[in-house]
UniProtKB/Swiss-Prot annotation:
Present in brain, where it is restricted to neuronal cell bodies. Present at lower levels in pancreas, liver, lung, gonads, uterus, adrenal glands and pituitary (at protein level). Undetectable in intestine. The keyword Nucleotide-binding does not apply. The gene is Pmm1. This is Phosphomannomutase 1. Mg(2+) 1 binds at residues 19, 21, 218.
Length: 262
């Protein structure tokens, strides 16, 4: 009987895992101080983590100053979890070049450059392919565009499906090569080995024996870079539309007594 009572009293081990762009911050912008403060309040009740497609330096820049991010979050998974931090310590890092090999990698890069060379857009800037540890990030307009140019491209992309058509061309060209593609943010898409989507981080969480992993993301429809982890049976998925929506969902789940105040 004592064992049963002890089991009933055991505090559930819960992890709230958040996407970054569109979920905790506006795309590629800094986190709002009120959202940041709420997350620390949430951390008093559950463990918290982030999983983003961007490299560690970009995630750190958006969610704090310097390396604050690995102190403010229990888990930080950069580049879909191929770069992993737990309780402030680097756990592991994988590299796409070792996995794919140089020949396939160059074929992929050359195809993307050739395809983009034929695109006529209102504007093109720089950094069309960003090489990361766990993926290639491909941007037809170029990642160095301004916020205004980013919005302009995003609106055009909604009408003309620029990224969607690009991805379809890649799927045809590299069929059977073990590659996956997903949209992320407003101006780009990611290319990565099969299995290296955001679910990659869940494998390393298995050993921590969480009772529930809540995942919050905004790109949760098929083709979005949150879809696979959102739909994975190991998570309870929550589709959000903004950082404020994320905060409200968490209030309803973990602070129901104050949810009406939002």
């Amino acid at each position: 009987m004592a064992v049963a009572v002890e089991g009933a009293r055991r505090k559930e081990r819960i992890l709230c895992l958040f996407d970054v762009d569109g979920t905790l911050t506006p795309a590629r912008q800094k986190i709002d101080p009120e959202v940041s403060a709420f997350l620390q309040k949430l951390r008093s009740r559950v463990q918290i983590g982030v999983v983003g497609g961007s490299d560690y330096s970009k995630i750190a820049e958006q969610l704090g100053e310097g390396d604050e991010v690995i102190e403010k979050f229990d888990y930080v998974f950069a580049e879909n979890g191929t770069v992993q931090y737990k309780h402030g310590r680097l756990l592991s890092k994988q590299t796409i070049q070792n996995h794919l090999g140089e020949e396939l990698l160059q074929d992929l890069i050359n195809f993307c450059l050739s395809y983009m060379a034929l695109l006529r857009l209102p504007k093109k800037r720089g950094t069309f392919i960003e090489f990361r540890n766990g993926m290639l990030n491909v941007s037809p307009i170029g990642r160095s565009c301004t916020l205004e140019e980013r919005i302009e491209f995003s609106e055009l992309d909604k009408k003309e499906k620029i990224r969607e058509k690009f991805v379809e061309a890649l799927k045809t060209e590299f069929a059977g090569k073990g590659l996956r593609f997903s949209r992320g943010g407003m101006i780009s898409f990611d290319v990565f080995p099969e299995g290296w989507d955001k679910r990659y981080c869940l494998d390393s969480l298995d050993e921590d024996s969480f009772d529930i992993i809540h995942f919050f993301g905004n790109e949760t429809s098929p083709g979005g870079n949150d879809f696979e982890i959102y739909a994975d049976p190991r998570t309870v998925g929550h589709s959000v539309v903004s950082p404020q929506d994320t905060v409200q969902r968490c209030r309803e789940l973990f602070f129901p007594e104050t949810a009406h105040e939002a």
